[in-house]
């Protein structure tokens, strides 16, 4: 019996520059549609924004908190409190404390 080779792990991504699906040329305050997946964009001057719906009003683009790149849902986010991220499948994540432990949770439920 021979050993099965281990699958290669993706390279770490700890900032917006390596995050897939960030939409260019977004207008701050403009309407947007999806507040759950691939929510990030950049303005013409390079500011990172995200599509959000405060208090369930119509979604629009807001200035983004600091972004930690691509992270796994429900993984520890110690050191990234109040930051946002994106899961490998595009889910919007935010670092939330749950029972005293910081974890990456859904950003559209924060």
Where are these predicted regions, by residue range?
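Extracytosolic low-complexity repeat regions of secreted or lipid-anchored proteins
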Residues: 38, 46-110
